Amino acid sequence: MRLSKMGYFLFKIKQKFVTHNHETICEFYRRGGVKVGKNNIICDYIPIGEPGLVEIKNDCVISSEVSLITHDHSINKVTDKGSNLFGRIVIGNNCFVGQRSTILYGVELADNIIVGSGSVVVSSFSESNIIIAGNPARKIGTWNEFREKYQEKAAFRTELDDIICGSIDKLVHK
């Protein structure tokens, strides 16, 4: 079964009349064939050609405009079979996939991986507690390094007005 944009659109309309929560979005993907664990947050519609080939384990955040591509039709150009290449995508426990990232077929991510925004993940990562980013994605750091660098700058959205009005040094500068 394909997850169509129209189906998602109708789902979102229905959702406006019920209590909004991320679990209902996850349920939409479960019904479509994606294996979705518990306590996940999926922020937006994710186009998935073959939902049965995707697994998102527990406690993950999938940001908006993420693409999970489970096939590659380009093989059709170099063979006369008219076929595709297919592969599973597995996102481990407690992973964060940044906005506009793409994960290609055959990729498995270990637990506790942060995928930087805009990354293109073309190969699997079996090491846990790392940060990957880029095109193609590569390891750029560890959770501990990330925590040490940014822990003092971490804030809740409810604190943002106070930061803007007074503690501007708490904002991240690159």
Task: For each feature predicted by the language model, list its residue ranges.
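Short-chain dehydrogenase/reductase
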Residues: 96, 114, 131-133
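Terminal amphipathic alpha-helical/low-complexity segments used for targeting or macromolecular assembly
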Residues: 1-33, 135-174
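Flexible, glycine/small-residue-enriched loop-and-beta-strand segment within the central core
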Residues: 22-31, 43-109, 124-126, 135-136, ...
